[in-house]
Swiss-Prot record:
Transmembrane segments: none annotated. It comes from Rhodopirellula baltica (strain DSM 10527 / NCIMB 13988 / SH1). This is Large ribosomal subunit protein uL6. SUPFAM superfamilies: Ribosomal protein L6 (SSF56053). The keyword Iron does not apply. InterPro entries: Ribosomal_uL6-like, Ribosomal_uL6-like_a/b-dom_sf, Ribosomal_uL6_a/b-dom, Ribosomal_uL6_bac-type, Ribosomal_uL6_CS. Pfam families: Ribosomal_L6 (PF00347).
Amino acid sequence: MSRIGNKPVAIPSGVTVSIADRNIDVEGPKGKLSFKHRPEVKVAVDSDTNQVIVSRDGDDRPSREFHGLTRAIVANMLVGVKDGYEKKLEIVGVGYLASISGDTLQLRVGYANELHRKIPTDLTVTCPDQTHVVIQGCDKQSVGQFAAEIRSLRKPEPYKGKGIRYQGEQVKIKPGKSATK
């Protein structure tokens, strides 16, 4: 059983945390995030040790689940507003490329038409070259969600490995048909 919820979360320098009712607001150099936690858990800021402490009232299963979840979300918020999150995507395939036009990501990945995806306002998307896409933001969930949506437009296929993949992702290549003699 995980006891991650019992660990306090240290507040980095340059980050402010404010709690009102069930709303947690975190502000730092990369941006501002807010989260409304469940009533099963309690969140408090210990100003002496400069830590966020998450506790729960009951010991029933949902309370234990939300205890660890809330602690992990608060920790991700603190890292996000301080350092930010980043996902890198690679586009593999002949003629496959990406570009940015205004607030739209344009992808040519083997379909008859170009695919257009609107970039969320809280994210920064760049294309260092035509075969790489870099997604940055302070919210870990929205960075990962947008990266997953882009990857799902053309997942890597198992025979040649063409498609959109995360940087460093290993695609298992299947052998083709073997000719019999």
